Swiss-Prot record:
Residues 606-618 have a biased composition (Acidic residues). The gene is dnaK. PROSITE patterns: HSP70_1, HSP70_2, HSP70_3. Residues 496-512 have a biased composition (Basic and acidic residues). Belongs to the heat shock protein 70 family. The keyword Coiled coil does not apply. InterPro entries: ATPase_NBD, Chaperone_DnaK, Heat_shock_70_CS, HSP70_C_sf, HSP70_peptide-bd_sf, Hsp_70_fam. This is Chaperone protein DnaK. PANTHER family: HEAT SHOCK PROTEIN 70KDA. One of its GO terms (molecular function) is unfolded protein binding.
Length: 624
C-alpha cells in the first residue's frame, strides 16, 4: 500500500514527515540530515543536484544554482537559460519535492504517492495553485494544501491538555512571515483546530536578515580595499553563505568573526575580508525588519476580537525565530509570555502536515482541521468597484452566491472579473481571472438576473461560476496558475487598504455618484421620450438642458461638477412630474387613470438611488 507524507516546502529548507503507528516521524535525507536545503543546481555535465550537495557547490556554479525559489511561486518568473531551457518556479520546486519523495521512499521501503504540502497562510490563490502544480510535476497526488501555522498548531496542540485553548503561531521562515491565532477545542477523544485569524508578509524572512549582513560586509570591504564585491557573482555567493553562518552564530554568541580569504583581487594582490560583527550591531541594522512583524501580530489580535491575555500558548515556527531579538519581541508583544520552546521550529510544520495526511487517509480519526481564506474575494462591478462575496478569514471550505444585473439595455453578455484583496477598487487588488457569460436574453438594464457563485475548496483554491437565471446558461472557471498575471505583495494590499481608507472611500463615493448620475440621465431621457406630447416645450427644453449639462459633466473628470449637475437635474425633474400630473388632471377620467400609470415610474425614477450591479439576492452557504 502506498504511503502519504507531510511536506514543509520551505524557502530555505524543506522537511518531510510520515505517520508510523499513528505518530509522526521526521525522515532524514540521504545525506543524514533532517532538513533539506531548498537548493537546486544544474552541473555543466548535465547532472541535477538537490539539497545539501547543490548548496555545497554553489560558489563554483553560481549561475546554475537556484535557491529561495518559493518567493517566485505564482508569478511568471523563469530561470535564465540553462542548457537551452528556462525553468519555472514550479519546475524547480518539483525537483525539491522529488528529492523528498525519494528520501521518504528509501526510508519506508515503500512507494510514496500522496502528500499534504504546506504553504504560508498568506499565500494567495496563484501561489497555492503553483504549489499544487509543483507537487503534481514531482509525481505526487496532493491530498491537501494547508497553511503552515495551522500545521504547526496541529502538531503542537494535540499534545496539550483537554481544555479549549487559544494558540498563537508566530512563523518567521527564510522568505515568508505569518502570524495566526488558532482555537483548539477538545473533548475526551476528539480535537477540533480552527483558525480564528491570520495575517502576514510574503516578502519578509531570514533571507532579508542575511542580506543586511551582506550589504554591511560589501560596504566594509570596499572601505578597506577599494574593491566593490557586489559586482562579482562568486564573491557575492561567498558573502551570502558567510552572512547566513554569522546570523546563526549570533543567536548563541554576542559576536562573530567573518573571515573570507582571497575574496577578490587588487593591484597589490589578493584582498581578504576579516570583520567582527556583534549581536548589537546586527540587531541595529535589522531593527526595521523586526518592526515589520509587529503590525500583522496586532492585526490578528484585533481581527479575532481577543485580548493578548487570552492566549494560552505561543509557538515559534521557522528557523529565523531562533534569533534572540525575535523571541524577545514576541515575548514583549504577548505581555511577557514566554514562547514555547518544546517544539523544533524547523520540523513542527512538516509534523503537522503528516498528521493531516493521516487524517485524510483515515489513519487518524481524532482531529478536525478548519482553516480560513487569508484575503477577501469578489468581482468588479460598474465603476471599478470591488464587490466582495467572501470576506477574509472566512472558514473554508465555503460557498457564497449573490445575484447581479446588467448595466446597459439589451446587454448580450457580462464579463465576470475575479479579484482578491482588501481595497475598495479592483485596480488596487490582485486579478485572479476573467470569464464571460454570453447569451443573455435581450432586456432593459436592471432586468436580467445573473447569479455569481464563489466556491473555495479545502485547499483554498477558488472556483467561480455565473448563471443567467432567465436562460439557464452557465459559465464557470477554476482560478489556475496566475503565472501570466503581475505579482503583487499581498501584505501591501491589506496595509494600503488601511492607510488609504479615506482616499478609497472618496473614490468609491465618486464612482457611486457617477453611477447614479448615469442612471438619472437614462431615466429622465426615457421619461421625456415617453411623454413628449404631454410636456410643455419650455419645461422639456429646461430639463433636457440639465440632462445635457450632466452628460457633459460625466464626460469630464471633475467630480464636483458631476455632483452639481446631478443635484440640479434631480431638482428640475420634478417639473416633469408636475407637468405630466397637470395634463392628467385636465384629461378625462380614463385618460387620468392612464396618466397616473405613466406618472408612477417618474416618481420612482426620480427618488430612487439605483446603483448598477446592485445585489438583489443574497444566499450564503457555508460548508464546515
Amino acid at each position: 500500500m502506498s504511503r502519504a507524507v507531510g511536506i514543509d516546502l520551505g524557502t530555505t529548507n524543506s522537511v518531510v514527515s510520515v505517520l508510523e503507528g499513528g505518530e509522526p516521524t521526521v525522515i532524514a535525507n540521504a545525506e543524514g540530515f533532517r532538513t533539506t536545503p531548498s537548493v537546486v543546481a544544474f552541473t555543466k555535465d548535465g547532472e541535477v543536484l538537490v539539497g545539501e550537495t547543490a548548496k555545497r557547490q554553489a560558489v563554483t556554479n553560481v549561475d546554475r544554482t537556484l535557491s529561495s525559489v518559493k518567493r517566485h511561486m505564482g508569478t511568471d518568473w523563469k530561470t535564465q537559460e540553462i542548457d537551452g531551457k528556462k525553468y519555472t518556479a514550479q519546475e524547480i520546486s518539483a525537483r525539491i519535492l522529488q528529492k523528498l519523495k525519494r528520501d521518504a521512499e528509501q526510508y519506508l521501503g515503500d512507494t510514496v504517492t500522496d502528500a499534504v504540502i504546506t504553504v504560508p497562510a498568506y499565500f494567495n490563490d496563484a501561489e497555492r495553485q503553483a504549489t499544487k502544480e509543483a507537487g503534481e510535476i514531482a509525481g505526487l497526488n496532493v491530498l491537501r494544501i494547508i497553511n503552515e501555522p495551522t500545521a504547526a498548531a496541529l502538531a503542537y496542540g494535540l499534545d496539550k491538555g483537554k481544555e479549549d485553548e487559544l494558540i498563537l503561531v508566530f512563523d518567521l521562515g527564510g522568505g515568508t512571515f505569518d502570524v495566526s491565532l488558532l482555537e483548539v477545542g477538545k473533548d475526551d477523544d476528539f480535537s477540533t483546530i480552527q483558525v480564528r485569524a491570520t495575517a502576514g508578509d510574503n516578502r519578509l524572512g531570514g533571507d532579508d536578515w542575511d542580506q543586511r549582513i551582506v550589504e554591511w560586509l560589501i560596504k566594509r570591504f570596499k572601505e578597506s580595499t577599494g574593491v566593490d564585491a557586489s559586482t562579482d557573482k562568486i564573491a557575492k555567493q561567498r558573502l551570502k553563505e558567510a552572512a547566513e553562518q554569522a546570523k546563526k552564530e549570533l543567536s548563541s554568541s554576542m559576536s562573530t568573526s567573518i573571515q573570507l580569504p582571497y575574496l577578490s583581487l587588487t593591484e597589490n594582490g589578493p584582498a581578504n575580508l576579516d570583520e567582527t560583527l556583534t549581536r548589537a550591531q546586527f540587531e541595529q541594522m535589522t531593527s526595521d525588519l523586526l518592526d515589520r512583524t509587529k503590525k500583522p501580530f496586532k492585526d490578528v489580535i484585533k481581527e479575532a476580537g481577543i485580548e493578548v491575555s487570552d492566549i494560552a500558548h505561543v509557538v515559534l515556527v521557522g528557523g529565523s525565530t531562533r534569533m534572540p531579538a525575535v523571541s524577545e519581541l514576541v515575548k514583549q508583544e504577548t505581555g511577557g509570555q514566554e514562547p514555547n520552546k518544546g517544539v523544533n521550529p524547523d520540523e513542527v510544520v512538516a509534523v503537522g502536515a503528516a498528521l493531516q495526511a493521516g487524517v485524510l487517509k483515515g489513519e487518524r480519526k481524532d482531529v478536525l482541521l478548519i482553516d480560513v481564506t487569508p484575503l477577501s474575494l469578489g468581482i468588479e462591478t460598474k465603476g471599478g468597484i470591488m464587490t466582495k462575496l467572501i470576506e477574509r478569514n472566512t472558514a473554508i471550505p465555503t460557498k457564497r452566491s449573490e445575484t447581479f444585473t446588467t448595466a446597459d439595455d439589451n446587454q448580450p453578455s457580462v464579463a465576470i472579473q475575479v479579484f482578491q484583496g482588501e481595497r475598495e477598487f479592483t485596480r488596487d487588488n490582485k486579478p485572479l481571472g476573467t470569464f464571460e457569460l454570453t447569451g443573455i436574453a435581450p432586456a432593459p438594464r436592471g432586468i436580467p438576473q445573473v447569479e455569481v457563485t464563489f466556491d473555495i475548496d479545502a485547499n483554498g483554491i477558488v472556483h467561480v461560476s455565473a448563471k443567467d437565471k432567465g436562460t439557464g446558461k452557465e459559465q464557470s472557471m477554476t482560478i489556475t496558475g496566475g503565472s501570466s498575471l503581475p505579482k503583487d505583495d499581498i501584505e501591501r494590499m491589506v496595509r494600503e487598504a488601511e492607510e488609504h481608507a479615506a482616499e478609497d472611500k472618496k473614490r468609491r463615493e465618486s464612482a457611486e455618484t457617477r453611477n447614479q448620475a448615469e442612471q438619472l440621465v437614462y431615466s429622465i431621457e426615457k421619461l421625456i421620450k415617453d411623454n413628449e406630447e404631454k410636456l410643455p416645450e419650455d419645461i422639456k427644453n429646461e430639463v433636457q438642458g440639465d440632462v445635457d449639462a450632466l452628460k457633459a459633466a460625466l464626460a469630464g473628470e471633475d467630480d464636483e461638477a458631476v455632483k452639481t449637475a446631478y443635484d440640479k437635474l434631480n431638482e428640475s425633474q420634478q417639473k416633469l412630474g408636475q407637468a405630466i400630473y397637470s395634463a392628467a388632471q385636465a384629461a378625462e377620467a380614463p385618460a387620468a387613470a392612464a396618466g397616473e400609470e405613466a406618472s408612477a415610474p417618474s416618481s420612482s425614477t426620480g427618488e430612487e438611488d439605483v446603483i448598477d450591479a446592485e445585489v438583489v439576492e443574497d444566499e450564503e452557504k457555508k460548508q464546515q
